[in-house]
């Protein structure tokens, strides 16, 4: 008969951000344990609050399945001596299987008789299996941070205070340090009391009786409904931030949402400051009207019931008011100084002690951004906006507001720049230069912001590499991988030409030419920045499950241009299942293998038709001449591939009728020039020799 097993790990309050991943880990470990133990089950349900991680196994088999198997031992000639007596090898083998020599049978394996015995292992009961393994399920969990308590050396996310371990209505014994498993759980810290769980199936209902909503999904739905009800009552608009909702949900066991207010005078502060104060610092949901204007109200969630809710709201209002008062002070005070004053202060702000100051970084970024602006074809207006943004883009780091709210760097730069009369495009670029702030974060929307973001990240990576501070393994203290991945994403979004190695060399030359290296010695660079960026391109492809051989093909192309890598990968990925794809690639790679051995100057590939020896040469020559007229930078990668693929039958005929490596040197060189011309066009796709076609 199917059973239900319950395991609840009771803890001191966990940080909100670890609750969900931890209970999912517990579920995964429980599933693996049960499967490894051959104990069948139907489902594993999770429950979690800040004080508990729980799994409930449904439809659990009452015992393991019995196991019958046939085990092969030594060959007969080893198992018996010349007189037919059992040898030590046979006796030892049978004992090892829990059998005797009487159980041995012989079976032929490829013409040789071997010893075999049949073994039978009776399945253990579910209680026996659980008793033997649940301790490991609990103790072998991993957490981002761990702690010890009392005099124990054992580490866990938080001290374990109780354990409930029930198989239906029977306690399954588990002992962790001084905590023995039982059937008693704990209710809400303030509203509830200890509660005895009658059976594993009663867990959720029993906890509800002591003011604990154990199901995280139901608790979250309750919070969402309560917020919506408050908004509807007051004609408010509340955009529920899902990350905040998840955090709040993992801070409470019995949620009650309530509304609060703050003085309208604080609405003169930028919205971003108000939202940051409420959402990020106080975990409040902010309120707007139908036109998306902030209103002087908020919604919060308490871990408790509605008793004395007015006092709770007033307490939260006081805390928020204190923070907004600080913000108002800094907002007013910061505007008493010019942008140039803040820029001058950056001369005393260290970017890194081995690299220099933030001011010096800005000077390098100004040169890099000017160089990239020309390369990317920005208009004169955009170039001027970019140059001005690069001159001042870090100034807000030394403002009081960013000192109090570091997460608003860039945002306040935008706000203050516009207040001081700067072009809004300059302010937008200052805001956007941090983007993207994560692997899938928002990208800059403006070209000016995109170039500044690339320039800033290129400088950071180049500077750290120049002083030998490169990421290794999982160690990346300066987030250089994230910044490099950001460059890759921005380049793909903008579609800019970005030959990695050429740009690395050109940018370093620009900095040296403008005497803006500030003692950075690029000659001492321990690893090429280009290789580092190329690895991030690989990461982008791998994240999207692009075939590894397609990735190698485009990565190992001669130009190593990020834009061309993306275009080529898109085309090869789109055509890999075409009926003629295999034949086309094989024709190309045969041609490429031959031309790879050619020792001819790539700048003199003039073909002499008078040296042709068959019609196939002429037909291919005519087709290539026509293709060369179309094969310009304006031609899309898709059209290039299709046009080259159309040459396949002509290339096949060419090889069937032509002895490429003719004994006549002039004829041979003419053949190679003709093929090299095609190879140069094929190589735009990358190194097709890396492709695996079946």
UniProtKB/Swiss-Prot annotation:
Oligomeric form and interacting partners: Tetramer of two alpha and two beta subunits.
A Pfam family assignment: tRNA_synt_2f
Gene this protein is translated from: glyS
Biological process, per Gene Ontology: arginyl-tRNA aminoacylation; glycyl-tRNA aminoacylation
GO CC, alphabetical: cytosol
Descriptive protein name: Glycine--tRNA ligase beta subunit
One term of GO molecular function: glycine-tRNA ligase activity
Species: Lactiplantibacillus plantarum (strain ATCC BAA-793 / NCIMB 8826 / WCFS1)
Subcellular location field: Cytoplasm
Class of enzymatic activity (EC top level): ligase
